[in-house]
Amino acid sequence: YTTKYYGSDIPDSQSFDKQAERASDFLDTITFERLVDGLPDNERAQTKIKKAVCAVSDKLYGLELAEKQALSAAAGSDSKTDINGKSSGIIVSRNSGSESISYASPSEIANGAKAWSAVYSAAGDEQATNKLLYDTANVYLMGVRDNEGTPLLFAGL
């Protein structure tokens, strides 16, 4: 993973196996199941597919960490609560005299996430996550063909 396909984000083999399985499922989806029965015979195509799995695995691992960090930050940060005691916002400032509390707006929260990285901004947003993963895989899979000569990313019949 790290030496042959230059993966770098996943610290252990158990975590890699989990993310690689999820990445393979994602590649099966975007290649319209063309890889379910195995890789193409062409060795260069096989290498590109394996690199795509590793790159998507890295992104999936980063997304998982970002979501865990967001949940942890939300649980540990000050937030406003509604009538039922459920959290409904993040407190960004608080004054004591004559009590004044300011809450982060959704756009402020989103802008902060976008500033971190594409992975953090995609975390929790299914459409952004899918685009990030597709763009990551596309770099490796563009032009790669199956044994019948059909491009893996071709959506036609």
Name each region found by the language model.
Residues T2-L157:
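Divalent metal-cofactor coordination and adjacent catalytic microenvironments
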